[in-house]
Design a protein with these regions (language model features):
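Sequence/structural signature of beta-propeller domains
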Residues: 1-243
Length: 243
């Protein structure tokens, strides 16, 4: 289970429902809040193994999507929106996908992709792995509730993308520039990626949900995605308990 509010993944026992462990970034600090006994930073079930930079996600914009890749046995966590690296949520359009071993919690791969929709279409909703095509199907949405809204289903192919896990960004971008999110604009990112031979995730928009017959555009938060054995996509909408 991924945590949309922070960069965290929790593994539960399917039969008992008990927490086995949770996976969080290195240097995660829970001391600012007084937790009840058994909560907070409990070493027995906390694996602080993910890259520290993920602590710099925007508030409430953590791992919104999580998908299991049945081909390599890894979990792929998708940051919902561009991170606030350096404390600045600015105009970055760079987002990240982090692959991790669900048992050890160790990160295995990381991939970058830039937003391809309008500026307000900046929220990953959910993702699912398609083993027939070796790619991920991903919801990327805005907050609109009309037929003109953008709630795309994207196909994301990671096969040719550069693995940036552990990448020395300062060597490419300069002293103190430790992440591409710190660059001024998308053009600067594209230039830097070209210089560093960094290939982003290949993205193709398959469809836009509000344009489909029978889809009520007032359901503005598609945040669940599943793939049936026959290839049918099932989309779930979150209404935040609205009635």
């Amino acid at each position: 289970v991924s945590d949309e509010y922070r960069p965290q993944v929790a593994l539960f026992d399917a039969e008992s429902g008990e927490l086995i462990h949770r996976i969080v970034p290195e240097e995660s600090d829970y001391n600012a809040i007084s937790y009840e006994p058994g909560r907070g930073d409990v070493p027995e079930f906390t694996k602080a193994t993910l890259p520290e930079v993920y602590l710099e996600r925007r508030g409430s914009r953590g791992f919104e999507a999580l998908a299991y890749n049945s081909d390599d046995g890894l979990l792929y966590a998708f940051i919902q929106t561009p991170m606030s690296v350096g404390g600045d949520s600015s105009s970055s359009t760079v987002r990240r996908i982090l692959a991790m071993d669900p048992i050890t919690g160790e990160p295995q791969h990381e991939y970058m992709f830039s937003q391809i929709g309008p500026s307000n279409q900046d929220k990953i909703g959910d993702a699912v792995y398609d083993p027939e095509r070796g790619a991920f199907l991903v919801i990327d949405r805005d907050n609109g509730d009309t037929v003109a809204a953008n709630k795309s289903i994207l196909r994301m192919d990671l096969s040719d993308a550069t693995d940036t896990l552990g990448y020395d960004w300062e060597a490419l971008l300069g002293d103190g520039v430790y992440a591409p999110e710190l660059l001024e604009n998308p053009a600067a990112v594209a230039e830097a990626f070209a210089e560093g031979d960094i290939v982003e995730v290949d993205q193709v928009e398959l469809l836009n949900l509000p344009s489909l017959p029978g889809v009520d555009p007032r359901f503005d938060k598609p945040e669940g995605l599943a793939l049936k054995p026959d290839g049918t996509l099932v989309v779930g909408f979150d209404n935040d308990f609205a009635r």
